Design a protein with these regions (language model features):
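Non-catalytic beta/alpha edge segments that cap or flank active sites
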Residues: 1-74
């Protein structure tokens, strides 16, 4: 018989929207992702929008992992 030991893990998510035109006011997909995460009991620690530039995206993902253990790029 196998015994499983599980412990709860707190998940803190970062939501990164990639767009050169969207703003926090009109980013409906980012807002929907945050809403779904919060409904699932997952806190959103970071929400940001970055330009569609690979270096900016990479920098934001790496920075986000300093304070969040889940990063969603949208």
């Amino acid at each position: 018989m196998q015994v499983h030991h599980e412990r709860p893990v707190h998940i803190s998510a970062a939501v990164i929207t990639v767009s050169s035109t969207r703003t926090k006011e009109n980013d409906s997909s980012g807002k929907e992702i945050m809403h779904l995460l919060e409904m699932a009991g997952i806190s959103v620690g970071i929400y940001t929008i970055v330009r569609d530039d690979i270096e900016e995206i990479r920098r934001e993902v790496l920075t986000s992992f300093r304070s969040c253990n889940c990063v969603i790029v949208n």
